[in-house]
Amino acid sequence: MTKEKTLPLPRSECICPICQEILLEPVTLPCKHTLCNPCFQMTVEKASLCCPFCRKRVSTWARLHSRTRTLVNTELWERIQKQYPKECQRRASGQESDDLADELASCPAPLLCQPGEIRQEYEAEVSKIEAERLAQEEAERKASEDYIQKLLAEEAAQDRLHSEAVQREMEEQLKIDEELARTLSVDLDVSNASCSSVSSVTSKKVVVSKSSKNVKNKQRVSGDIERFLTPRAVAVVGIDESMNSDSSECFIVFDEGEDEMPELSPQCPSTSLIQERGVELIMPYLSDCYKVESNTTSQQDRCSERSQVCNGTYSSCSDSIDMEESMAIKKQSTTAGLFPERGYHSPENGMESNTMNCSTPKHLGMTGTLKRKCEDCSIDLEEKAGSCRNVKKKKLSLTEDCPVPSVHAGKLIELEENLYERRRQEEQDRLLALQLQRELDKELKQVNRGKGSPDEYELRTKRGLKLQECLKLQECQDSPLPLRKEIPVQDNSRNTQSEYSPDENKKPSRKNSVRSARVRQSRAVANTEGSSDGINVLKPINKQPTILDLFQRSAGK
């Protein structure tokens, strides 16, 4: 700062840009433009409070410094006075400096632009700006295309991954299904092979004494095949085995020829007994239960039967009798729950059957009883088969006599009846509402023309009023003449009203004309029959009396 202050000011910085003379009391504006005080007073304060070079508003700054009298840059003014004292003195005295005039004269002449030069510069600038704009738009378009391509590629990749995952899952599922089908087919082949081998071995050893036993064996073999094909038929066989008292359960036929090997007979009832019982097995639950039971325990039961028959380890038939009783109770509960119309119930075991049906699952109970039946068969069953059949006949005869209504089925029937009744009542209410709405619409469409209604007919005046008027006229005619003064005037007024009605095209009715003619005739007759006094009275009052009238009045007096 000190070096700048010590350096001499160039002459160009000491000249006012407005008056082109030495600065006199220079004023430095906030925008760093400097001009002399007289020029500041003339241009800024009087014209506008803005800088004459950059148009910056300096009103606040000018008011503040004029109030404090600090408009003049004293430091610059002192330096100018030190460097150029003569010019400052000459300027203060009002004389023009010759040096400045010489400098102005020595300035080079201004150069003018060539024709079309400015237009060319303008067009060049416009083309430059347009090129920049096009380049920017092209860059934006390219960026948007790249982004769209990127999004499409990502979406295609996601779709491809999803399709691959779905295809992989389908292939895995197909593999699992193939393995399951293969295992099922192998199990089915093994079971069929074992059944065929067992049947071939037993056919040599078993000697059937009766033709009914051959029929039962054939039905048993067919039942083994139907166990895999028709679950409903298997369910019929499985349930009737526990309920049919006449089926020969667990009795043994000995082969007299070959080492007396025992063999279990098939547990299949005849079709005639099924028809006699009338058990209708149309519910899918029993067939499903027995299908699961047959699939899980068929081979184990056959193996256990063979081992027990070969070893000869059979227990007594007392346990089988108890199990048959429990099986009958369970079957009563199942048939009572599923078929309420054909329920089987014994009076002493009714509560037990209901509790057993609620507490234990049906298919588990059936599987347990079938296993124990096969395990508890003994060699001496021929002697005790009759007692077993008698016990079962007694139990089933008691159950057939006493049907039990199912509580659940009764509730369902009652609920269905309530719903049907409610539906019927709602339909009746709907029909009644429609009928009432139709009647209401019909009443609204009808027009009431009765008396007192807004749409009543505008009737003519009654004939009774006209008759009363005629009677009044007759009474007036019969009355003395002074009372009959005003009557003709009223009739005339009424006639004039009828004649001068507002409707000019309206014609008088024929009856009124006839009636008016009769009234006039009667009045004329009355006037002729009356005395001269009556004639005088009927004359108009405002008429000027004649001499004859005066003589008549005097004669009358």
UniProtKB/Swiss-Prot annotation:
> RING-type zinc finger positions in the chain?
16-55
Q: Does the keyword Metal-binding apply?
A: yes
Concerning CDD domains, the annotation shows: MIU2_RNF168 (cd21952), RING-HC_RNF168 (cd16550), UDM1_RNF168 (cd22265)
Its principal location?
A: nucleus
What is the uppermost EC class here? transferase
> Which positions does the motif MIU motif 1 occupy?
170-193
* Cellular component GO terms, alphabetical: nucleus; site of double-strand break; ubiquitin ligase complex
- Where in the sequence does UniProt note compositional bias of the Polar residues kind? 490-500
Motif UMI motif: chain residues: 145-153
Q: Name one Pfam family in it.
A: zf-C3HC4
Record's keyword terms, sorted = Chromatin regulator, DNA damage, DNA repair, Metal-binding, Nucleus, Transferase, Ubl conjugation pathway, Zinc, Zinc-finger
Q: In which pathway does it act?
A: Protein modification; protein ubiquitination
**Which residue ranges are recorded for the region named Disordered?**
482-543
Span(s) of short sequence motif LR motif 1: 112-130
From the Swiss-Prot or TrEMBL record, state where the protein is found.
Answer: Nucleus
> Which residue ranges does the UniProt annotation give for the motif MIU motif 2?
422-445
**In terms of domain of life, where is this protein from?**
Eukaryota
Enzyme Commission no = 2.3.2.27
Query: Which Gene Ontology MF annotations are present?
Result: chromatin binding; histone binding; K63-linked polyubiquitin modification-dependent protein binding; nucleosome binding; ubiquitin binding; ubiquitin-protein transferase activity; zinc ion binding
Indicate which residues form the motif LR motif 2.
449-460
Q: Indicate the quaternary assembly.
A: Monomer.
In the record's own words, the domains note is: The MIU motif (motif interacting with ubiquitin) mediates the interaction with both 'Lys-48'- and 'Lys-63'-linked ubiquitin chains. The UMI motif mediates interaction with ubiquitin with a preference for 'Lys-63'-linked ubiquitin. The specificity for different types of ubiquitin is mediated by juxtaposition of ubiquitin-binding motifs (MIU and UMI motifs) with LR motifs (LRMs).
Family note: Belongs to the RNF168 family.
Query: What is the recorded name of this protein?
Result: E3 ubiquitin-protein ligase rnf168
Q: Which organism is it from?
A: Xenopus laevis (African clawed frog)
